[in-house]
Amino acid sequence: MFSRAGVAGLSAWTLQPQWIQVRNMATLKDITRRLKSIKNIQKITKSMKMVAAAKYARAERELKPARIYGLGSLALYEKADIKVPEDKKKHLLIGVSSDRGLCGAIHSSIAKQMKSEVATLTAAGKEVMLVGIGDKIRGILYRTHSDQFLVAFKEVGRKPPTFGDASVIALELLNSGYEFDEGSVIFNRFRSVISYKTEEKPIFSLNTIASAESMSIYDDIDADVLQNYQEYNLANIIYYSLKESSTSEQSARMTAMDNASKNASEMIDKLTLTFNRTRQAVITKELIEIISGAAALD
């Protein structure tokens, strides 16, 4: 009496609500899984923000006395008006970063500044060598400037930098065998908890300082004294840049983790709303099926 096509169509129509229900249940499971994952990530970002806030408070306290040493050492170069002769070609670029990430554009801003300086100095006929303080800056620049790397330092940023760390870096540079004429230290100077600025400070070799016209008025300065002062000055400037970079990094990480936590909250709210709507749709479909079945029996 009934055709085969009619029976097939009836079967498809009868099974359709069940497939819809299974699909909605699978969607609910996916949403639940995503919610759980995002909530776990939010816990991690909140914890990292708290850790970064504690480290930032300590770094900011230690930055104030470190600035005195750094600015004092830089004042000599400014007041002495040390200038490098045109025939001097060797330039050293020191980039200060760290081994840790999740702190915004802290490391990429240093790399961008160093790439720009390398291009400018190379175009001017200078011989440029690079020094990377921190594994992040080495990882960014080594792919494109591996032939210009003099030395790279790791294990930076895991603990607060000390003057001993800066002294080790300065000694390694002095013993590297590369006799540079002048150089620059590129780092992020801390301005506020939400702001930092990439800056560049000069450094000079012993020969450049000794041959400066303004230094010739001090005839009684012993060569050993001037050498000790130059080495101490180099360590001071590196220490100052490490402290500035460390404070900037912790404040940037704290801000980044705060933004990540807020974004996670927004995603949780949206997924919760989607979950509730999907669950309501499943319940509505089940009620329709029950009512339709009851009406058919009547």
Swiss-Prot record:
The keyword Membrane applies. It is a peripheral membrane protein. Pfam families: ATP-synt. It is found in: Mitochondrion inner membrane. Keywords: Acetylation, ATP synthesis, CF(1), Hydrogen ion transport, Ion transport, Membrane, Mitochondrion, Mitochondrion inner membrane, Phosphoprotein, Transit peptide, Transport. Its main location: mitochondrion. The modification N6-succinyllysine is found at K49, K115, K154, K270. The keyword Membrane applies. The modification N6-acetyllysine is found at K39, K55, K115, K154, K197. One of its GO terms (molecular function) is proton-transporting ATP synthase activity, rotational mechanism. The modification Phosphoserine is found at S146. InterPro entries: ATP_synth_F1_ATPase_gsu, ATP_synth_F1_gsu, ATP_synth_F1_gsu_CS. Residues 1-25 form a transit peptide. One of its GO terms (cellular component) is proton-transporting ATP synthase complex. Belongs to the ATPase gamma chain family. Component of the ATP synthase complex composed at least of ATP5F1A/subunit alpha, ATP5F1B/subunit beta, ATP5MC1/subunit c (homooctomer), MT-ATP6/subunit a, MT-ATP8/subunit 8, ATP5ME/subunit e, ATP5MF/subunit f, ATP5MG/subunit g, ATP5MK/subunit k, ATP5MJ/subunit j, ATP5F1C/subunit gamma, ATP5F1D/subunit delta, ATP5F1E/subunit epsilon, ATP5PF/subunit F6, ATP5PB/subunit b, ATP5PD/subunit d, ATP5PO/subunit OSCP. Subunit gamma, of the mitochondrial membrane ATP synthase complex (F(1)F(0) ATP synthase or Complex V) that produces ATP from ADP in the presence of a proton gradient across the membrane which is generated by electron transport complexes of the respiratory chain. ATP synthase complex consist of a soluble F(1) head domain - the catalytic core - and a membrane F(1) domain - the membrane proton channel. These two domains are linked by a central stalk rotating inside the F(1) region and a stationary peripheral stalk. This is ATP synthase F(1) complex subunit gamma, mitochondrial.
